[in-house]
Structure formats: structure tokens, C-alpha cells
Amino acid sequence: NGYGEAEAALCVTAMSIGGIVFQYPLGWIADRIDRRTLLILCAASGVLGAAVTPFVVHAPAAMYAVLVLWGGIIMGVYTVGLTLLGERFKGPRLASANAAYVMMYSMGMIVGPTIEGAGLDAWDPHGLLVALGAISAAYAAFLALRKLQVSLSA
């Protein structure tokens, strides 16, 4: 039930390759559209990736293509978020904000796998994807709400 270690490592590698390859295109897009909107789209890609992946698991080429695309876009959450941080803070405040950003990102790397593992335990083999999709949906919804609040207060 599920993939072995070698296959799982290939999946992680595919997502990581996407994260590397998509840095420049996402940066280019971030220079041309509203960065908050791009951040919401990157977060929402987590929902789409989680929804599409079960349909391509039996077609390795399609699955790795989806994982490269998904990894590239979802990893843009960090990059675009960091760009927004740089827009908002300057000087010593930027250093403090960056430290807080890294700390919160690290907390997500601790809490996320716990939630994902619980999802996998609860609904094997789809629980991991359900958890990833739910986390991404919650983050995208939070970002959209925050963007709406900022636009209403302007």
C-alpha cells in the first residue's frame, strides 16, 4: 500500500527540482502582478496538486510532471512571502522580520508533518494528500481574507 522508499525519494526529488526550476519564472511573475495575489495562487496550488496527484500515480511520467509543477509553485510560497516581507520592512526591522519569518516557517516544518502523518494514519493512502490540500486551502483562505481586509482598510 503506497510507495517504497526509493519511489518516495523520487517524488520528493521531483518536487524539489520544481522548487529550483520555478524560482526564476515565479520571480518574473512576481515583478509583473500583485504579489499578494501570486502568494494566494501559490498556496492554492497546494489544493490543486493534492487533488490531481491521485489521478496520475499509476502513470509515472505524468506523476513526476505534476510533482515538478506542484513543487515549483507551492515552494513559491516561501519566495513570494519573503519578497513581500522585503517590501514591508527595511533596515534593522527587516532583519527582525526575517528572523520571525524563518522561525514561523520552521514551525510549519515541524507541525506540518505531524498533521500530514495524522492524516495518513486516519485515511491511508489518501490522508497525506488530504492533509496537504487542507493545509494549503486554509493558508490560501487566510491570505485571501487578509488581502480583503487590507484592501477594505485602504
Regions from the PLM with identified roles:
Residues T37-V52, G133:
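Structural signature of the two symmetry-related core transmembrane helices
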